[in-house]
């Protein structure tokens, strides 16, 4: 590329081309990472205590933030739903409206976003620091698979924790909706919960359940991958953490749209 | 016997290793020396299988490391010990758990047997009192000794040391060297020791290899390296500026004091 004219033309073209190439390369690496994680998930032995430890961290550790966000989401839904429904004289449907919104959409999505922010980022930072301080290399040198010790337990814990946290989010959200709609605005408990059970069925619960499982897998996949492949130093780890949170959040929303449109 | 043959490795188009070759005989410890940033740690990580070469081969008793299946590589690694530059202790575990970890995961020993072996190893490295401490609570020297205990707990046949004394004071450096020497005599492992502690490491290694510009430029006994005619090697081990640079500086109008240039260290 000695010719200056050639340089002027080729350099921008190469820069443009590098973006999709990097993107495709990263997709491939993420795909291989997932394949390896799945392989070790089904190849015994399973590190049971590490799974429990991660469930404690991802699941139990996120309960407070899930309860708080669930309560306030339900309360906001109670307010907004009541004033919207009162315009058409249908405040009796507040219960079904709050329940269906939470069970099918808001519960799985918001719970997953909260877990991404609280636990996903921490998983990425922990793996990134372990990568930088050669702790992951130390595992490999001992003849132990980092996937079996670090990645698979996080995957399983996330798959178990996120649906349970979503369930907590839904229950607290429905109660929050009742607190506002019922206690403050006067919808009776019988109407609120009676109409809810009439309109929200098991299919709605299952729809949210399937979504939350997918989101749990997504969070673990992205967080572990970004941490495992984190760059050098504090900057590398902080960039990996930011990317993990942003990518997980975006993928959760895209996945939610796809699941809603194709499956339910 | 470890044979490293014509190793090449590039990172982002920069060639770090350009055909490095080395042989380590059974029971020998080879000190790998050379200027910073020349790829000594990269070389060591290839020997351990943590990095794959672009080309070249690594043989253990005739077995090609690059041609091994994953299960064979895992089996081979159980014969390895690796002392990382910063220790690489698991920071969520105590010193005791760090040292016990390889035994718990790779052997069928009872917890009582593991305890006996771990305490004996910690005693050997002078950390009997620190078993309940976490890596963050250890000094640099203690962390290195704990990492050494973890690396040696399964009596490896091959030990790789990546700058085990970097950032430590001279007394701790001496004690770590003594520890490596005594464990080498006790366990009889073969090994490669990346170090900048020249000439201290020459006191207990059998061979010295000099990595320069991506190739092993010199291999010989500690005595032979002092007698070599290779000016680059000679300048390096005497801590002088490279001969070429020195000649250039002698031609400039003002006289450059070499000791001043090196921060006043004689």
Please provide the spans of the model-predicted regions:
Chain B
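Conserved ABC transporter NBD signature motif
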Residues: 56-64
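Helix-to-loop junction immediately C-terminal to a conserved catalytic motif
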Residues: 48
């Amino acid at each position: 590329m000695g010719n200056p004219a050639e340089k002027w033309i080729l350099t921008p073209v190469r820069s443009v081309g590098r973006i999709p190439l990097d993107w495709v390369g990263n997709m491939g690496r993420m795909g291989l990472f997932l394949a390896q994680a799945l392989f070790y998930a089904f190849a015994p032995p399973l590190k049971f205590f590490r799974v429990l430890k991660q469930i404690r961290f991802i699941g139990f550790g996120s309960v407070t933030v899930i309860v708080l966000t669930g309560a306030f989401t339900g309360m906001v839904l109670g307010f907004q739903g009541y004033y919207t429904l009162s315009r058409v004289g249908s405040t009796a449907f507040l219960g079904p409206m709050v329940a269906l919104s939470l069970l099918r959409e808001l519960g799985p999505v918001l719970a997953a976003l909260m877990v991404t922010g609280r636990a996903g980022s921490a998983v990425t930072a922990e793996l990134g620091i372990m990568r930088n301080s050669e702790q992951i290399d130390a595992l490999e040198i001992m003849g132990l698979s980092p996937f079996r010790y670090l990645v698979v337990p996080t995957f399983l814990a996330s798959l178990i924790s996120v649906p349970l946290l979503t369930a907590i989010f839904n229950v607290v959200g429905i109660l929050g909706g009742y607190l506002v709609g019922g206690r403050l605005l006067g919808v009776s408990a019988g109407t609120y919960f009676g109409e809810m059970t009439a309109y929200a069925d098991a299919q709605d619960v299952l729809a949210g359940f399937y979504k939350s499982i997918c989101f749990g897998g997504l969070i673990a996949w992205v967080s572990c991958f970004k941490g495992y492949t984190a760059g050098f130093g504090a900057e590398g780890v902080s960039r990996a953490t930011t990317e993990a949170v942003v990518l997980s959040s975006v993928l959760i929303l895209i996945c939610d749209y796809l699941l809603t449109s194709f499956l339910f | 016997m470890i044979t490293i043959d014509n190793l090449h490795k590039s990172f982002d188009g920069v060639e770090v290793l350009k055909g490095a070759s080395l042989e380590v005989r059974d029971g020998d410890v080879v000190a790998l020396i050379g200027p910073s940033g020349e790829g000594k740690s990269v070389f060591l990580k290839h020997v351990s299988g943590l990095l794959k070469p672009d080309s070249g081969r690594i043989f253990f008793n005739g077995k090609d490391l690059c041609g091994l299946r994953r299960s064979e590589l895992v089996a081979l690694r159980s014969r390895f010990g690796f002392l990382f530059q910063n220790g690489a202790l698991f920071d969520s575990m105590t010193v005791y758990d760090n040292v016990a970890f390889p035994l718990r995961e790779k052997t069928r020993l009872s917890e009582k047997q593991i305890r006996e072996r771990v305490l004996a190893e910690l005693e050997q490295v002078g950390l009997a009192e620190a078993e309940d401490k976490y890596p963050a609570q250890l000094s640099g020297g203690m962390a290195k000794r704990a990492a050494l205990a973890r690396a040696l707990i399964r009596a490896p046949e091959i030990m790789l040391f990546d700058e085990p004394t970097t950032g430590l004071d001279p007394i701790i450096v001496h004690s770590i060297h003594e520890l490596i020497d005594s464990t080498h005599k006790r366990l009889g492992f073969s090994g490669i020791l990346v170090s900048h502690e020249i000439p201290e490491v020459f006191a207990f290694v059998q061979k010295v290899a000099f990595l320069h510009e991506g190739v092993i430029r010199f291999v010989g006994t500690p005595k032979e390296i002092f007698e070599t005619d290779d000016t680059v090697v000679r300048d390096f081990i005497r801590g002088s500026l490279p001969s070429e640079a020195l000649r250039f500086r002698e031609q400039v109008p003002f006289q450059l004091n070499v000791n001043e240039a090196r921060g006043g260290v004689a």
